[in-house]
Amino acid sequence: MRVTTSFPLGTLRDTPSEAEIISHQLLLQAGYIRRVNSGIYAYMPIMLRVIEKISAIIERELNSIGCTKLLLPQLHPADLWRKSERWEGYTAGEGIMFNLKDRQGKEFGLAPTHEEVITSIASETINSYKQLPQCFYQIQTKFRDEIRPRFGLMRSREFIMKDGYSFHSSEKDLASFYEKVGNAYENIFKSCGLETVGVEADSGAIGGASSKEFMVTADAGEDSILFTKSGSYAANIEKAVSLPSQPIPIKDNIAEWLETPHQKTILEVCDNNNLDPSQIIKVVIFLAQFEGEFEVPILACIRGDQHINEVKLFNLINKLHNFNLINLQKIEDKNTIEKNLVDFPLGFIGPDLDNKTIKASSNWVKKWTRIIDPSASELSKFISGGNKVNFHKLFQEFSFASKDYLIGDIRNAKKGDKISIANDEELKEKKGIEIGHIFQLGQKYSEKLNAKFSDKDGTLKNLWMGCYGIGVTRIAQAAIEQNHDQKGICWPIQISPFEVIIIPTNLKDPIQSELTEQIYNNFLINKIDVLLDDRNDRAGVKFKDAELIGIPFQIIIGRDSVNKEVELLSRTNNTKFKISTDKLLETFISESEIMYNKNS
């Protein structure tokens, strides 16, 4: 392709001010995307080529394990999502689904994911074990009403995603196929030139028994990954488990009541009373909001040197009740407290807080749901709030069971923690960008949407189901996070918009012009993905643009063209050497094969 006639470059000289991370800056500056609105981008021709190459790699790998491509609607009827009990959670409050009503007043949502639709189709088309297993996938635009779109294509309101769904006759078959997809994902990401790590993950709103995320390690990542040096364990921080450090015992001479005026934080109490945070139990209140406006107050207790993992807490509360949990909110504002609680000493709460603190006029359930992390429940002697303003209290041999406490892991694992009693490896931490996620959904959706099949013995059973996602546009931006320098992007050759760019320094020179056309046409004949920068701009402008857009190889045609010599430059390795034109094609093919084989 030629820059002047079919592939104009829209590079910018200045760094866009709205871009927070380097990959977002480079996508805008190199002309790959254009911002239309917050979280909404146009994919320019050069970006579309990257997306198409990533998509081709995905299709190749998924087709090789027996998956079939289809295309599902983006507009979903609310009735389907109500059957799965996800409509309220996805549309109310901070829900991420764009939703609307048509002319007849019927409700619809713009799809962030497709479990309901594909399960509905499976219920109509799969009726026998003889048709199983089956896996369908699509590559399509998705929509999410992000509260705060940021980081370009990392967290946008419209993005391209590959989502796949498999159906099975047994849990064993699902688990086997889940592993097969995981292996295919590793091949996909390697073929895209990415370094990734697979980690245990929370299943979130999609649900299911187990799930695994695939992360690109990068400083700009929004997720934290905890892992061991040996590679024996890796998990997203939302899912990670570990052993906390040992608490420091409390001295015997401490008073039963501590006057702690205006000491509402753990740090303030410790500094003023010669205590360690591990000797304190902090009590945090949350409000669990269930479908049907059912609200439950939560008392969550954890050791003072640890932090509550709200994802773990959400999942634990969701299992306790027969209703669908929509939202979990930490209660700290004065208005909410005054409306629902009486004589409530915020900042001085103890684990023995009475149910009578909940006002009779409150819409809340009139009993605290009490949850405590093992890091706190194992303390036989500790300091906590005295349920009186400006007072903390010494608790000895306190019976959490007598207060109906549920003991459960609600703690954030952190770097430096030990894995377990049997494994004393310490956790390390890195930032990561999630580019893929696979789930064993089990029978969650088939039960609710009545997707059944007839087994070998003739009995009707619910389908077993898996779900598999890849962020296509995220892969493109994550690749830039891992492959750039001070000059611009350094694309992995597999997903680069072109393999090579030809840069004549002076097209007014007839020798250069003729040689340029010869090389360009020869590369086209040999089916090499080539871009010709045939602009009449200064050579310096062309060089800068070529470095910015990041095509792996550059062929520079300059003064030595009179001797039938050109320069072949590797953007990836930052190497450059002169070569005669009769050896150029052969050398380029050899050098590019080395790059391809690196990630095959």
Curated annotation (Swiss-Prot):
One GO cellular component term: cytosol
Entry-linked InterPro entries: aa-tRNA-synt_IIb, aa-tRNA-synth_II, aa-tRNA-synth_II/BPL/LPL, Anticodon-bd, Anticodon-bd_dom_sf, Pro-tRNA-ligase_IIa, Pro-tRNA-synth_IIa_bac-type, Pro-tRNA-Synthase_IIa_type1
Segments forming a coiled coil: none
Record's catalysed reaction(s): tRNA(Pro) + L-proline + ATP = L-prolyl-tRNA(Pro) + AMP + diphosphate
Homology family: Belongs to the class-II aminoacyl-tRNA synthetase family. ProS type 1 subfamily.
The protein's role, per its UniProt record: Catalyzes the attachment of proline to tRNA(Pro) in a two-step reaction: proline is first activated by ATP to form Pro-AMP and then transferred to the acceptor end of tRNA(Pro). As ProRS can inadvertently accommodate and process non-cognate amino acids such as alanine and cysteine, to avoid such errors it has two additional distinct editing activities against alanine. One activity is designated as 'pretransfer' editing and involves the tRNA(Pro)-independent hydrolysis of activated Ala-AMP.
Protein name: Proline--tRNA ligase
Natural source organism: Prochlorococcus marinus (strain MIT 9215)
Gene label: proS
